[in-house]
Amino acid sequence: MFIFQDCREGSQFTESGDTMIFKFEAQAPKIDEKAYAFNTATLIGKVELKEYASVWPGVTIRGDVNRIEVGRYSNIQDNSVLHVADKYACIVGDYVTVGHCALLHACTVEDHCLIGMHSTVLDGAVIGHGSIVAAGAVVTKGTIVPPNSLVAGI
């Protein structure tokens, strides 16, 4: 495990071979003992992985200026990025699948959703309960997707 004292202080760290976990401005990620993060995933700052959440190879979850939550039984697949904005946190509900190479930026994904591979969900967007965002789709800033919807295209 890489644990930096603070991202802004330089390269003080410890290594034990697991996930890269970084503090940011004294905020360290919180990982439930039943959650899993692959050893090439990077978790930074105000990040919480809840019970049975999983994070896979190459994922970056950066809670620097706001918080990120990954809900129970949710999975963030290979090379996806979750980030925040000053105004918006990034919240992933329970039982959510985020496909490979997706970008979730300062948005909310409610429970039981599927976010397709290479899709993008932007600031302030809300993906309603049980919805699907198709592979490659772009959900623009501030879009509210109703529950049980399918989103495709831009």
Regions found by a protein language model. Give the residues of each.
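Short, Lys/Arg-enriched N-terminal segments with co-localized hydrophobic residues
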Residues: 3-19
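Glycine-rich hexapeptide-repeat left-handed beta-helix
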Residues: 19-31, 36, 58, 64-94, ...
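Compact, Lys/Arg-rich rRNA/RNP-binding cores from ribosome-related proteins
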Residues: 41
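N-terminal glycine-rich anion-binding loops that anchor highly charged ligand groups
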Residues: 44-50
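A general secondary-structure boundary signal
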Residues: 51-52, 94
